Amino acid sequence: GVWPVDSGRICIDGKDVTALPEYKRAAYLGRVFQDPMTGTAANMQIEENLALAARRSGKRGLRWEVTKEEREKYKKLLTSLNLGLEDRLTAKVGLLSGGQRQALTLVMATLVKPKLLLLDEHTAALDPKTAAKVLEITDKVIAENRLTAIMVTHNMADAIKHGNRLIMMNNGKIIFDVSGEEKKNLTVDDLLRKFSENAGESFSDDRAMLG
């Protein structure tokens, strides 16, 4: 959903987007949601989903078929994921596992390079092994495309391991902000202690203990 701004401004790549309607702000963003079913069209083929994502910022016409050039591009992209999807381009997305769908959604969200990639607990619905694979793919896609990304997570181990800056929030306010070597050297126990010190309460979400 969209939360109204009651103070300050939102700037993306130097442009003030605070007052823009949601559909215009969306042009700056790539998004992967928590629910693996959300980011793809289940009844469409893998290559059709990718084509929709690739054409979202271009001029729309009557052409619909996936071209040979597009198909080769998608095959190359999917091969790099090591999930076997490159050989299933004409398969319906609804036949994929949750992890495969999240990986596909991630590729779709970055086909047209966004100014900002938003990852909204995008591994929370996955089992630990699949979540680790999707996070590995996430790191790869972000690095290769040199993207700016914000990953929301309750998993403190993942927050420490991934990204170059960690911001801890409570009740809508920043209570801890760390980056660089200090972030790399953190442990989950350190973060739990920081939360208790700065929020004045104990952390109650068991998902933060994972890892």
PLM features: what roles do these ranges have?
Residues 8-15, 176-178:
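Conserved ABC transporter NBD signature motif
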Residues 16-30, 60-67, 184-189:
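ABC ATPase NBD coupling module
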Residues 44-56:
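Q-loop/switch helix immediately C-terminal to the Walker
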Residues 117-120:
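Catalytic Walker B motif of ABC-type/P-loop ATPase nucleotide-binding domains
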Residues 131-144:
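Helical segment within the ABC ATPase nucleotide-binding domain
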Residues 153-154:
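H-loop/switch region of ABC-family ATPase nucleotide-binding domains
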Residues 173-197:
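Conserved beta-strand-loop-alpha-helix hinge in the C-terminal portion
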